[in-house]
């Protein structure tokens, strides 16, 4: 009796699903990629409960015939390759024929499809990989795939799902990446009846960037272009003044496929050279066209990692393209633009409970280097999610020059202004910053800071400053040299540490509320973690699509620090993911004290320097900054006399003692 058996097809598909389908976002990725391969120009993704309850992908592509429909659920059945040679010149996103059978094996699947040549369409219903219904039906040309009760027959997989908001953020990220990879396709994402993302499908990548990352971000992106005999590189990268705290905003595309590649990420950063601050990363969309023979995509279950021939040459091409584009730009920040950015913009006061999430109607005019708007008219006879666009008139509206007539009611309504992100060039370069990913080191730092005891500080008489960095003072024990940045950092750390927890009745109403823009996935993640921000006195309310409004701020935060402070806190929260209130407050106090302290080469007058020393003397631990660096060093009178050889011990020279 043989002990080796061939596994049933359904079981084999479930095993394959373990590699291909990790979460609802994996299903969306595979099915949308199939829609792209079917030459669709419009794709709508609808989900419920972040996709765990239902996902529906509708496209207007080529569709499938009645005969091909049941074959699509067979493993390794595909229309995209037919011979071994095809495997080495793949231009489609899918080719293995594994995704649809894998999805069908762990869910209830319904497919409606029709081709342009067929008299009627077809419907297929399968549960757990077994076909239960296959018959003719009337349906538009294209394909509609509905996935329900994902992982219903593999409950162990459900234990590894994160919260609904986290899973939704993954879905939004997948749709955003595919939208950037294919700006010629109109994408729509709807979650629980709310529209989260919509792109116009005009083929303009900058316009897609504006719809995903916001208008202000898109305006600070510059295009890159370069080519050699093997590669064509295009896309957009952000100016050095526009950065993020992680690499999540870097999108690398090869032949329309989003991939992850450490070396190409490195090439992007090398293109910026020293223009980026340490720990900051650009926003970038790099579109690479390559001969399929030079790329092997058949090395990873999800095809997000590929092998590239001549990878070093491609890295050099990317770095050169970015550095040359940046060289042509005026990288000096425009003071007038910064002033205009902080000016108020009037809006009529909305009803927060009924604020609609409208699709972005921003369109980019490359000749005028600006955006304009279109009015969208939806026909009742059109399929859901597919819009017919009509220009308002022959003259487009310039977004920046759009003026709203002020009626009496609008004049009485409060104004709002868009908050600007902190300039990384103004951040602290003296510290590497918090290593939030090294939990052990962070925990040790927080324990040390928490267990500090009150110290006795000597009386100091300030008398000078050197190089705008070090303060000189004398005391009973000799000469003291103080690092002014570390000193103020310690003072501010103890201030913020004490004040951040006092948020119950310490909120001040803003005369002009601020608006904070985020990408779709970050917006969703922040909504889930909003309670942590509330604990430190930051109350952000959803205000339209991908935007929060701040109406009040904690007393401990100065109004001049609101814009940069809130963005920094949100970035920290997105980086740390899971953090206790206590740890978050401590991290926040360290971060804010470091960012808000005076830097090197900053001259202080006598009064300011003496006040800093008085404040330092009142600190619980005036001898170290929160990172552990010394705040001051001391040369005693004896040390000075030895250095000047006024005294020598046992007639032994200082050089012989090894000191000089």
From Swiss-Prot:
GO molecular function, one term: ATP binding
Domain of life: Bacteria
Pfam families: DNA_mis_repair (PF01119), HATPase_c_3 (PF13589), MutL_C (PF08676)
Chain segments annotated as transmembrane: none
Entry's Gene Ontology cellular component terms: mismatch repair complex
Function per UniProt: This protein is involved in the repair of mismatches in DNA. It is required for dam-dependent methyl-directed DNA mismatch repair. May act as a 'molecular matchmaker', a protein that promotes the formation of a stable complex between two or more DNA-binding proteins in an ATP-dependent manner without itself being part of a final effector complex.
NCBIfam families in alphabetical order: mutl, PRK00095.1-3
Name this polypeptide is given: DNA mismatch repair protein MutL
